């Protein structure tokens, strides 16, 4: 099936779980300490990354969803760093602060891309703190469509069964990334996403595909789960529900560099998709595609909307050129710039394509390696040109432009000027035809500020869409 990216910006998700900060101290090593037989690292780089449940929330935000994050933190510098890190990407913190406990921190000392030692700063959460966290999280249930319980066995999610029941009673789906061998703790959840190791820890060794399905259905019945999605590394994923045949989804990863955080990406994509009304098989397919992207990156990473769109297009055999959406174009432009290609952009109505247009676009293309043509949609053409225009509808105008050898990408826009889309894409060179002053060209200031340039090209004399229309009307 061909899958399009849903409107993730409409997703409202609450993540509840064990939040932590992954901190990295990195630098060169050149000598052994005189105090002990250990290397001395001269730290020249410190990096903080939100981890655990916070990484799940970041994944949802990066996909474009609206997300709040409930977790237990201390009253310390680490909590401040964690808060700053998630707020910068649009995640709303809903902390339960316990002054006497440290915010969980994993400090890694690195040199030459090797981890020399990891220092963990954490204490077990008392059961009453977990209850307090879940009680405060209940207040958010009326605002969301999906809740993710991100369990790293640190104690934030101690006994969530009552919380799950309250969420389900409000029509909120509850997804769980489980930990440990006791799945009864998650009784009543909508969906669990164990990996194969976690699944076998609960049900015992799985002999084959049929055995996996049988044991999964037993768990569904025993603990009142609606579905299980078992992630299986190079074998992809298997979705098991009570009332439908199992669904095996093959992996889409082309190269695997690091599986760190892949589980976070899976449940994040699932949650965001389900929150906007996707059917479960479609949500699983999107999650599988997202996982295939993230395992191709080093370290704990997130997947953006643009990366997911590009991966979906690739799986459908689409070339990435021609008529594209704005998100598709943003990704294609990023890839072109990484290759060192100079991207030129122009815009217009292009209602009746004529020789003057063709000549102009050839000139524009000659100024770089790739050419984007942004096209006014039908409503904006009517506002600009008056009743009776456009003569040709948007899809036809874009199809003709995309067929020209000089044009790489065609993208529509709905405003009267291309100011917004140019400001977002920021080509290397912005081109406009006619007798404009550079300072008056929409988007020109933004392109120049980003290090690009703006150029005005002349149109071929005596050829215009208006003249063609007038000539046709005169002969009728």
Swiss-Prot record:
GO MF terms here are: ATP binding; heptose 7-phosphate kinase activity; heptose-1-phosphate adenylyltransferase activity; phosphotransferase activity, alcohol group as acceptor
- Annotated active site residues, numbered on this chain, are 264
Entry EC no(s): 2.7.1.167, 2.7.7.70
One Gene Ontology cellular component annotation held by this UniProt entry: cytosol
- Copy the pathway line from the protein's UniProt record: Nucleotide-sugar biosynthesis; ADP-L-glycero-beta-D-manno-heptose biosynthesis; ADP-L-glycero-beta-D-manno-heptose from D-glycero-beta-D-manno-heptose 7-phosphate: step 1/4; Nucleotide-sugar biosynthesis; ADP-L-glycero-beta-D-manno-heptose biosynthesis; ADP-L-glycero-beta-D-manno-heptose from D-glycero-beta-D-manno-heptose 7-phosphate: step 3/4
**A Pfam family of this chain:** PfkB
Q: Where is this region: Cytidylyltransferase?
A: 345-476
SUPFAM superfamilies assigned to the protein according to its UniProt record, in alphabetical order: Nucleotidylyl transferase, Ribokinase-like
**Catalysed reactions, as listed in the record:** D-glycero-beta-D-manno-heptose 7-phosphate + ATP = D-glycero-beta-D-manno-heptose 1,7-bisphosphate + ADP + H(+); D-glycero-beta-D-manno-heptose 1-phosphate + ATP + H(+) = ADP-D-glycero-beta-D-manno-heptose + diphosphate
The chain's disulfide connectivity reads none
Write down the CDD domains for this protein, in alphabetical order. RfaE_like
Instruction: Share what the entry says about its subunit structure, partners included.
Output: Homodimer.
Family label: In the N-terminal section; belongs to the carbohydrate kinase PfkB family. In the C-terminal section; belongs to the cytidylyltransferase family.
Please report the name of this protein according to its UniProt entry: Bifunctional protein HldE
Record organism: Shewanella loihica (strain ATCC BAA-1088 / PV-4)
Lineage from the top down?
Bacteria, Pseudomonadati, Pseudomonadota, Gammaproteobacteria, Alteromonadales
């Amino acid at each position: 099936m061909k899958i399009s990216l849903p409107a993730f910006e409409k997703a409202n998700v609450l993540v509840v779980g064990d939040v932590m900060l992954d901190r990295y101290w990195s630098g060169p090593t050149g000598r052994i300490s005189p105090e002990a037989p250990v290397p001395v690292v001269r730290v020249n780089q410190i990096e903080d990354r939100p981890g655990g449940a916070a990484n799940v929330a970041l994944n949802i935000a990066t996909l474009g969803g609206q997300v709040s994050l409930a977790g237990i933190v201390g009253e310390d510098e680490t909590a401040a760093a964690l808060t700053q890190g998630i707020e910068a990407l649009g995640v709303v913190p809903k902390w339960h602060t316990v002054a006497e406990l440290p915010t969980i921190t994993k400090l890694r000392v690195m040199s030459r891309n090797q981890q020399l030692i990891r220092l963990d700063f954490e204490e077990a959460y008392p059961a009453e703190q977990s209850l307090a966290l879940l009680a405060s999280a209940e207040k958010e249930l009326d605002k969301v469509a999906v809740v993710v319980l991100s369990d790293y066995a640190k104690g934030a999610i101690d006994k969530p069964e009552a919380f799950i029941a309250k969420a389900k009673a409000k029509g909120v789906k509850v997804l769980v990334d489980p930990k440990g061998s006791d799945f009864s703790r998650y009784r009543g959840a909508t969906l669990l996403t164990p990996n194969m190791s976690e699944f076998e820890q609960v049900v015992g060794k799985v002999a084959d595909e049929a055995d996996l399905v049988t044991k999964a259905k037993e768990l569904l019945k025993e603990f009142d789960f609606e579905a299980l999605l078992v992630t299986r590394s190079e074998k992809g994923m298997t979705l098991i529900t009570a009332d439908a045949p199992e669904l095996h989804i093959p992996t889409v990863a082309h190269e695997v560099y690091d599986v760190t955080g892949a589980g976070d990406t899976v449940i994040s994509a699932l949650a965001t998709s389900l929150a906007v009304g996707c059917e479960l098989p479609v949500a699983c397919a999107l999650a599988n595609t997202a996982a295939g992207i993230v395992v191709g990156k080093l370290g704990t990473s997130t997947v953006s909307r643009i990366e997911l769109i590009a991966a979906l297009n690739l799986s459908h055999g689409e070339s990435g050129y021609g008529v594209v959406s704005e998100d598709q174009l943003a990704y294609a432009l990023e890839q072109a710039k990484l290759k060192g290609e100079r991207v030129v952009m122009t815009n217009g109505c292009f209602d009746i394509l004529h020789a003057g247009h063709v000549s102009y676009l050839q000139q524009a293309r000659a100024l770089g390696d790739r050419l984007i043509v942004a096209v006014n949609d039908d409503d904006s053409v009517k506002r600009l040109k008056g009743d009776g225009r456009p003569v040709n509808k948007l899809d036809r105008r874009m199809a003709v432009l995309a067929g020209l050898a000089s044009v790489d990408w065609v993208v529509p826009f709905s405003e009267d000027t291309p100011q917004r889309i140019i400001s977002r894409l920021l080509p290397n060179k912005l081109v406009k035809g006619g007798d404009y002053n550079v300072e008056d060209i929409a988007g020109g200031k933004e392109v120049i500020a980003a290090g690009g340039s703006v150029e005005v090209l002349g149109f071929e004399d005596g050829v215009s869409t208006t003249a063609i229309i007038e000539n046709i009307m005169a002969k009728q």
